A protein has these predicted regions:
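Conserved beta-strand hairpin/beta-sheet module of binuclear metal-dependent hydrolase folds
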Residues: 1-44, 118-130
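Active-site HxH/HxHxD metal-binding segment of metal-dependent hydrolases
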Residues: 11, 26, 33-108, 125, ...
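Core dinuclear metal-dependent hydrolase active-site scaffold
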Residues: 17, 96-122, 126-127, 158
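Active-site metal-binding loops of divalent metal-dependent hydrolases
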Residues: 31-32, 56, 80-81, 112-113, ...
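Anionic-ligand binding patches
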Residues: 121, 129, 161-172
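Accessory terminal helices/loops
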Residues: 154-164, 173-251
Length: 251
């Protein structure tokens, strides 16, 4: 069975090590802090053999060089990562990467950046989504368009609802405040927000999250909901997503 080791790094990033006991392989999912990844792997008794980058930002690929120098790990990611680090394999939507006998489908989730990808392991029921979607939020739209980003979120929405989403940042408390503003009559969201407050007060992580919960509470994944559309200008899903994203940027 695959093992996921999650740990905090930098200011608000999460690091992830994905380990396959059968093959002994370990993938670093993004590399916010190469030294911390190496420390975490050593503490687990694992050797990092692969790196899977989701996008090019330094808090996701900036640790590649340190890990490769220490381990010789093979680096996989979208072409845009070559802006700051070399890749052994360039991947895009529809490609498959493997860890031992486990297969991960590469999904185009562009919008935060133009080449952003996610890695979905259907047999394990997990997906590493980088900065495309967060618990109760989504990434800032630095490079993409509202249509592009909504199409990406729509692809995530089609995954099995029980899929566990590993998001790259602990932004959930702030996201919950905006979500309650955006969708104040959502009772399930209100309950989720109370749970988040309790977890953060106790110093607990709110990541990972489950897609089924996000489909019911995350306003950015619900831009196709008629009630939310009426509240945010009466437009279609793309227009509603754009309005929500602009409002969150200014919130």
């Amino acid at each position: 069975m695959l093992q996921v080791h999650q740990f905090p790094c930098l200011t608000d990033n999460y690091g992830f090590l994905l380990h396959d006991p059968a093959s002994g392989e370990t993938a670093a999912i993004d590399t916010p802090d190469g030294a911390e990844y190496l420390r975490q792997a050593q503490a687990k008794g694992w050797r990092i053999t692969q790196i899977w980058n989701t996008h090019w930002h330094p808090d996701h690929a900036g640790g590649n060089a340190a890990i490769v120098a220490a381990t010789g790990a093979r680096v996989t990611g979208p072409e845009e990562v070559t802006r700051i680090a070399p890749l052994d394999r360039v991947v895009a939507h529809g490609d498959v990467v493997t860890l031992g006998d486990w297969r991960a489908a590469v999904i185009d989730v562009s919008g935060h950046t133009n080449g952003h990808v996610a890695y979905h392991l259907p047999e394990a029921g997990i997906a590493f989504v980088g900065d495309s979607v967060f618990a109760l939020g989504c990434g800032r739209m630095f490079e993409g368009t509202p249509r592009q980003f909504w199409d990406s979120l729509s692809r995530i929405k089609t995954l099995p609802p029980e899929t566990v989403l590993y998001c790259a940042h602990e932004y959930t408390a702030a996201n919950a405040r905006f979500a309650r503003h955006a969708d104040p009559d959502n009772a399930e969201l209100a309950a989720y927000a109370r749970e988040i407050d309790a977890k953060r007060t106790a110093g607990e992580a709110t990541v990972p999250t489950r897609l089924s919960r996000e489909l019911a509470t995350n306003p950015f994944l619900r831009a196709d909901d008629a009630t939310l559309q009426a509240r945010w200008g009466g437009g279609d899903a793309v227009a509603t997503f754009a309005a929500l994203r602009a409002a969150k940027d200014a919130f």
